[in-house]
């Protein structure tokens, strides 16, 4: 994947996460702040940071619950070396339903 393809996929994924949270967080308990390719989620558990790392072609997640992760895009999913999937972690920790493969 070239840099342009990576940027498009990563930016689409990060925007999708922000959109899904705003749609499903009926109680407005998660403060969503998307600035460029950095998404901050202020929750009662702490602040999540999700951002694009172009040089590594990864999305990084900093979770106040489970710590830091680095995800790479493969076969339509963002997974880490341990096989954990970005959307699955966010679904579990934020109680928001995400599709594995955002469009």
Swiss-Prot record:
SMART domains: Frataxin_Cyay. One of its GO terms (biological process) is intracellular iron ion homeostasis. Keywords: Iron, Metal-binding. GO terms for cellular component: cytoplasm. InterPro entries: CyaY, Frataxin/CyaY, Frataxin/CyaY_sf, Frataxin_CS. One of its GO terms (molecular function) is ferric iron binding. PROSITE patterns: FRATAXIN_1, FRATAXIN_2. HAMAP family: CyaY (MF_00142). Belongs to the frataxin family. Involved in iron-sulfur (Fe-S) cluster assembly. May act as a regulator of Fe-S biogenesis. This is Iron-sulfur cluster assembly protein CyaY. It comes from Rickettsia africae (strain ESF-5). The lineage of its organism: Bacteria, Pseudomonadati, Pseudomonadota, Alphaproteobacteria, Rickettsiales. The gene is cyaY.
């Amino acid at each position: 994947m070239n840099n342009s393809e990576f940027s498009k996929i990563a930016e689409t994924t990060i925007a999708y996460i922000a959109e899904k949270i705003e749609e499903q967080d009926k109680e407005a308990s998660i403060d969503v702040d998307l600035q460029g390719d950095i998404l901050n989620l202020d929750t009662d558990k702490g602040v999540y940071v999700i951002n694009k790392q172009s040089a590594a072609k990864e999305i990084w997640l900093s979770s106040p619950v489970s710590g830091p992760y680095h995800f790479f895009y493969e076969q339509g999913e963002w997974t880490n070396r341990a096989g954990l999937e970005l959307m699955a972690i966010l679904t579990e920790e934020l109680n928001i339903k995400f599709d594995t493969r955002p469009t």
